[in-house]
Amino acid sequence: ENIERSSLLVVQIEDSEGVEIIKSILDVKGIDAVFVGPYDLSISLGIANKFDSEKFKAALDKIIEACKENRMPLGIFESNENRITKLKTSGFTFFCLSSDISFLINDAKRILINLKE
């Protein structure tokens, strides 16, 4: 009981099969949120990194609709401010802005630049 109160169960949708069965996934008791992995999803759809394609948008629309119907928080990995604004308007409620490795690389670059000065 304590684990349920202090845990968050987020399912990740990263392939076309996940999109197709999103409603069934959301029927599972205990899911707290859905997170879309856009890079893997676009590859699975055969349109690697083509996030403005109709096929990718249709997949997102299906996920968005299912999450809205189930009042399920929906997140995605996105660092572009313009796309974040559009995604927020369409129904996404949380965003992963970067990855741990990106933060580490950028910080290391900053330190090296400062050391050279």
Regions found by a protein language model. Name each.
Residues 1-117:
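Expand to "…catalyze enediolate/carbanion chemistry for C-C bond making/breaking, isomerization
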